[in-house]
Regions:
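Short, well-ordered alpha-helix to beta-strand connector turns
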Residues: 66, 80, 106, 148-149, ...
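Short, flexible coil/linker segments at domain boundaries that flank nucleotide/cofactor-interacting
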Residues: 15-19, 78, 104, 146
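Rossmann-fold NAD(P) dinucleotide-binding segment
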Residues: 74-126
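Structured loop/turn residues at beta-strand edges in well-structured enzyme cores
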Residues: 41, 78, 129
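Conserved beta-strand segments of alpha/beta enzyme cores
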Residues: 45, 68, 108, 132, ...
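Hydrophobic Val/Ile/Leu positions in short beta-strands of Rossmann-like dinucleotide-binding domains
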Residues: 23-24, 85, 153
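NAD(P)+-binding Rossmann beta1-loop-alpha1 motif at the extreme N-terminus of oxidoreductases
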Residues: 2-75
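Rossmann-fold dinucleotide-binding core
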Residues: 116-180
Length: 180
């Protein structure tokens, strides 16, 4: 697969916390954990969303926090270089079907569902071929300190350089990587 293209950041700037756009689709407990850790680690463009009917409440809750609340996953997907689907395993298929086609060319997409087969199927079915897939799963709950906890990384459809970038971005969790 050829990565990059119109709208994609050059490889040298994609991993720069000042310019890299990170997206979190799903602001439940795990989405919030990831968003806050990324922001606190200095990633300056963390775009988040939840279900459209929660937009106004989410916007009020996170106003002035350094997170950018967007109306829906289309907007998060279109502008983010690294996107994490933080949704329940039972909803991954419908959420990726809805927002996956909007994914920015050359972006890296991850999912953190606990059941990977439906996630992989949804990604392969609905994501454009010109995006990368490096999935993840934190082996702890949202109220457990992630430091030293296992974080599974799955290099599904991505070259090594994209895997290294995901490792760099997720380093803020201070988790122990487990590769599958």
């Amino acid at each position: 697969m050829e990565g990059g293209g119109e709208g994609a950041l050059p490889p040298a700037t994609m991993g720069d916390p000042a310019t890299c756009q990170i997206g979190i689709i799903g602001m439940g407990d795990m989405g919030r954990l990831y968003a806050l850790r990324l922001r606190d680690a200095g990633w300056q463009h963390v775009n988040v969303c939840d279900r459209p009917e929660k937009y106004e409440a989410l916007q009020r809750e996170w106003e002035g926090t350094g997170l950018t609340v967007l109306r829906d996953g289309h907007l998060v997907s279109r502008q983010s270089d690294f996107i994490v689907y933080s949704v329940e395993a039972g909803n991954i298929h419908s959420v990726v079907k809805e927002y996956g086609p909007s994914t920015k060319v050359g972006a890296i997409v991850a999912g953190q569902t606990s059941v990977k087969a439906p996630e992989r199927e949804a990604f392969e079915t609905y994501l454009p071929r010109d995006v990368y897939i490096v999935s993840c799963h934190s082996l702890h709950g949202p109220h457990v300190d992630p430091r030293g906890q296992p974080l599974v990384l799955i290099q599904h459809r991505a070259p090594d350089e994209k895997m290294r970038l995901v490792e760099r971005i997720l380093a803020c969790l201070e988790s122990r990587y487990v590769y599958m």
